[in-house]
Regions:
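Basic/polar N-terminal segments that are highly enriched at the extreme N-terminus
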Residues: 1-6
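Hydrophobic/aromatic beta-strand patches that form the interior of the parallel beta-sheet core
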Residues: 10-12, 92
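Beta-rich strand-turn-strand
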Residues: 82-87
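Metallo-beta-lactamase
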Residues: 88-98
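Conserved beta-strand hairpin/beta-sheet module of binuclear metal-dependent hydrolase folds
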Residues: 7, 14-81
Length: 98
């Protein structure tokens, strides 16, 4: 296996939504009113030759419209790893919001 076959994978939390357990599950559960926030992540997958971003997240304005707290912009989360978001050519989108 060469070094180009080995990737590092980073989960980068950028925001959250305060909510209760019942909001996170479809079926009734114990303690439905207990706090259970939902965290929001983007992913960076990289090796010496390539960087792939999984999902792109949202900014402060979109977070506010959706009632979410954005702790840092996704581009800033990537920058914490030395990744310039504007130079990434490969992006995987796992789902859409509408």
């Amino acid at each position: 296996m060469s070094s180009s076959d080995t990737y590092e994978i980073y989960a980068l939390r950028y925001g959250f939504l305060d909510r209760n357990r019942q909001s996170n599950f479809r079926d009734p559960i114990d303690n439905p009113d207990a706090e259970m926030s939902m965290d929001y992540y983007i992913w960076a997958i990289r090796n010496d030759e390539r960087t792939v971003i999984v999902d792109t997240g949202f900014d402060h304005g979109e977070g506010k419209r959706r009632g979410r707290t954005v702790e840092r912009l996704p581009a800033a989360a990537l920058a914490s790893l030395g990744i310039n978001a504007t130079l990434v050519e490969d992006v995987v989108i796992t789902h859409l919001h509408y």
